[in-house]
Amino acid sequence: MMVLLAGRHEQDALSPRGRALLSLSVGFVASVFAGSGFLLGLVREDLHFQCSFHQMGSDDPGSFYCADGISYIGVGVATYGVYGVILLIALGIAMADLKSSGMQSRLLAGISILPIAMFSWSTWYATSSRPIDQAPGANYWIQPLLPVTAVLVTAVIVILAAGLIPRPRLRTAGFRLAMALFVAAALIQPGSLSAVAVTLGTLAAAVCLEWRVPDEVETPTVTSARKPL
């Protein structure tokens, strides 16, 4: 009996749903432990959030004086609170018994965009709410975030376009292309890793669930009505 239960547990763990749940968990853990430090560096050193700009005389080019690390705890709590909610929603979809596996993977692919949207909005907010003693005429968003934003937007467009493809194999190829773009985005701007890791985990879960879909064009079921003879 124990052997049968162990065999069934191993089979469930290696199933597409088991791999999807594992991908979601690994993505969130990587975001917390690998991405939080890079996120703090981006917010503090590049975006100068909660920093003040001071000049000691007319010849001084000026420098930033930022808050200590404890002052940024709120940033982490807010960021990972949102990511945690996204994770719970994704886990619920992955564990749900939906009739259409293709729709299930599409939903996860759509949810994978949410961490990127959160990252984009929060970095915009961090650079838009500037105190009056910041360097005049400076834009702290363009240099650290414009290149990575272009890559992230491209990846999101690929996800949306792939979701419209009826063939599961081609749809999976689109999701994998988006995953490669997200990896490139994290290399361009390591501060985006906190969002990219959650997105990659969710998108990998969508790819895992695609393996349950037959490789054929998905068409709606049409019931033909015949008149009785």
Positions of predicted regions on the chain:
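Cytoplasmic membrane-interface segments at the C-terminal ends of transmembrane helices
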Residues: 10-20, 88-110, 155-179, 183, ...
